[in-house]
Amino acid sequence: MEQEQDTPWIQSTEHINIQKRESGQQTRKLEHPNSTQLMDHYLRIMNQVDMHKQTVSWKQWLFLKNPTQGSLKTRVLRRWKLFNKQGWTN
């Protein structure tokens, strides 16, 4: 039986799953992910992104509700630098 050559396409589509042996060495198990695994992975990533967005917006809301003098100064300086970059073109 002839073994399939690893083409760049196959290498890029293979899922690398690293498992640790009892001896502490790492082995790589190559497998083609099925559509269920891909969808599961996609949903997990999107959930993490959504949680990150919620955290960022929550921190921004807290900042606006109770800003410190230093944070206000930083915010004003950032806006000023951004305004200077844009210039009078708007």
From Swiss-Prot:
Transmembrane regions listed in the UniProt entry: none
Cellular component terms per the entry's GO annotation: host cell cytosol; host cell mitochondrial inner membrane; host cell nucleus; membrane
Marked site (Low pathogenicity) residue numbers: 66
InterPro entries, A to Z: Flu_proapoptotic_PB1-F2 (IPR021045)
Protein's UniProt name: Protein PB1-F2
Lineage: Viruses, Riboviria, Orthornavirae, Negarnaviricota, Polyploviricotina
Keywords, comma-separated and alphabetical: Apoptosis, Host cytoplasm, Host membrane, Host mitochondrion, Host mitochondrion inner membrane, Host nucleus, Host-virus interaction, Inhibition of host innate immune response by virus, Inhibition of host MAVS by virus, Inhibition of host RLR pathway by virus, Membrane, Modulation of host cell apoptosis by virus, Viral immunoevasion
Reported function: Plays an important role in promoting lung pathology in both primary viral infection and secondary bacterial infection. Promotes alteration of mitochondrial morphology, dissipation of mitochondrial membrane potential, and cell death. Alternatively, inhibits the production of interferon in the infected cell at the level of host mitochondrial antiviral signaling MAVS. Its level of expression differs greatly depending on which cell type is infected, in a manner that is independent of the levels of expression of other viral proteins. Monocytic cells are more affected than epithelial cells.
Protein family membership: Belongs to the influenza viruses PB1-F2 family.
Stretch list, region Disordered: 1-31
Domain of life of the source: Viruses
UniProt subcellular location: Host mitochondrion inner membrane; Host nucleus; Host cytoplasm, Host cytosol
Keyword field contains Nucleotidyltransferase: no
Biased segments, Basic and acidic residues type: 17-31
GO biological process: symbiont-mediated perturbation of host apoptosis; symbiont-mediated suppression of host cytoplasmic pattern recognition receptor signaling pathway via inhibition of MAVS activity
Residue ranges of coiled coil: none
Subunit structure, interactors included: Oligomer. Interacts with human SLC25A6/ANT3 and VDAC1. Interacts with host MAVS.
Polar residues composition-biased segments: 1-16
Stretches for region Mitochondrial targeting sequence: 65-87
Encoding gene per record: PB1
Primary localization class, coarse: host cell
Note: Is not encoded in all strains, and seems to be dispensable for replication.
